[in-house]
UniProtKB/Swiss-Prot annotation:
Chain residue ranges for the region called Disordered: 1-22
PROSITE patterns: RIBOSOMAL_L16_1 (PS00586)
Protein name per Swiss-Prot or TrEMBL: Large ribosomal subunit protein uL16
Cited function: Binds 23S rRNA and is also seen to make contacts with the A and possibly P site tRNAs.
Gene name in the database record: rplP
Membrane-spanning intervals of the chain: none
UniProt source species: Teredinibacter turnerae (strain ATCC 39867 / T7901)
Listed GO MF terms: rRNA binding; structural constituent of ribosome; tRNA binding
Positions with biased composition (Basic residues): 1-17
Cysteine disulfide partners in this protein: none
Length: 137
């Protein structure tokens, strides 16, 4: 699963996920893309589950790009532990997603097959997405 090899600090503050995606909002590698419509956060496991669903549907044909990376650590305290005594341990990593962010890209397959594959991937993700095509400038 995806996670940073090393970080400057082990734990991060919660922070806020405001605004729209300025960077990574256009399809730039493949022909088709899966774009987030809502804001939220995607765990490394969800990114991997969606990738597997797409890869299996296109039967390893074409090329897939993952455009998001989980770089934010999420901490949790163990069950039945009282509050206090410091921040919990890092349990998993998430990517914070703003509306307009392209999550996955694909090329080398037909549009119909890409739509089906992205529909399977979208079912694995906790936020609403839409299918987009590369726009020629």
């Amino acid at each position: 699963m995806l996670q940073p090899k090393r970080t400057k600090f082990r734990k991060q503050m919660k922070g806020r996920n405001r605004g729209l995606a300025q960077r990574g909002s256009k399809v730039s590698f493949g022909e088709f893309g899966l774009k987030a419509v809502a804001r939220g956060r995607i765990t490394a496991r969800q990114i991997e589950a969606a990738r597997r669903a797409m890869t299996r549907h296109v039967k390893r044909g074409g090329k897939i790009w993952i455009r998001v990376f989980p770089d934010k650590p999420i901490t949790e305290k163990p069950l039945e532990v009282r509050q206090g005594k410091g921040k919990g341990n890092v349990e998993y990593w998430v990517a914070q997603i703003q509306p307009g962010k392209v999550l996955y890209e694909m090329e080398g397959v037909s549009e119909e097959l890409a739509r089906e594959a992205f529909a399977l991937a979208a079912a694995k993700l906790p936020l609403n997405t839409t299918f987009v095509k590369r726009s020629v400038m």
